[in-house]
Amino acid sequence: MAKTSAKKSENKAKKGTQTNMWTGRFASGMAQSMVDLSFSLQFDAELIEEDIEGSIGHGKGLVESGVLSKADYKKICDGLASILKDYKAGKNLWKESDEDIHMAVERVLTERIGALGKKIHTGRSRNDQVCTDFKLYMRHRATEIRALEVSLMETVLDLAKKYFGKMMPGYTHLQ
């Protein structure tokens, strides 16, 4: 059975059709409308910083558990940093075949540092990556919102000091 599945994947690759990480034992692929629906890169590319941050943290855990050497971890971190730098510089790193930000980052990393790039996926699922990315994203946005709140409070305080003692019309509602 493994030979048959490998042969089908080989044939699909030769024909130029797309094979995704979730294809496997099925003889035919998903309907194109479902494939289009499941691709989220255009939406979750905004999570690139969080995805890379999560991968760096996960890599550290792999080093601590003895799965990854410190030298390999450094290569992975350098590769991830170069991806983020290129993304911020406006370089288009993505391909149409990239289903989501996780697969896109892993693909680019593997292209840059070789098979070592695939090790970053060891011991975690895409669901783990999605949850981590969203938690980091929300933490970052909450920090930004707190900074804006502080700025607003400082502005209100400055205005209160500037206009202290001045009359100001106030209404609880319009009637």
Segment roles from a protein language model:
Residues A2-Q175:
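A helix-coil-helix interface module used to build multimeric assemblies
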